[in-house]
Amino acid sequence: MSHKISPALKNLPDIDSWISIDVAIRGAQYHFIHIKRLLDMFDTGATKISVSQMNWLIRGFFWELVGAFDLILQWVNKRFQLEVESNKTRKWETIDVGRVQWSRVKRSRAKIAPDLWNNVIQYLIQVWESEWYFEVRTYRNYAHKSLFEMTEFTRTDGKGNSQWFISLAREGQGYDDLRILLPSYIEEFERLAANLKDLTGK
């Protein structure tokens, strides 16, 4: 049996892509607020349901961030009219979102502002190859396949909160408490969005 995607979910809606990108980054912040709340509760004794909730939230956190990067790809495809789409349809009013993937975008030429596109894609390649985005992608991919195991480090002096860790995503990555690690990824994404807006005059 062959199924076809509904046009409503196949084509890019006519909205400002930066709204969607900002919504995804705010979505990760929302998840972190609730993750931090649960971590604070864990210090008084975690329940089985709160462990499940933690996994839902951590998985959602990384899905939102990778979603933000995918939305950036949709934006650059539309903004620069990349050959990702023009090779197939030559129409820019119907952009097939499924075709807009990193493997295609990074080698595409721009119909609009090709010199600016060269600067933008070089910056996006730096982000893609960065340690932090490798970690985010790895955590997101892992979240599709398994739940996260958490390790607690409890202070023996009883002063201060426990520290909570998930497994390392990258060889050579340092261990950081989730209260430090997760906000650092949000900060990187905020920097990415701000730099792209500055670079493109958005």
Region locations from a protein language model:
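Acidic, Ser/Thr/Gly/Pro-rich intrinsically disordered interaction regions
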Residues: M1-R37, T44-W63, L71-K202
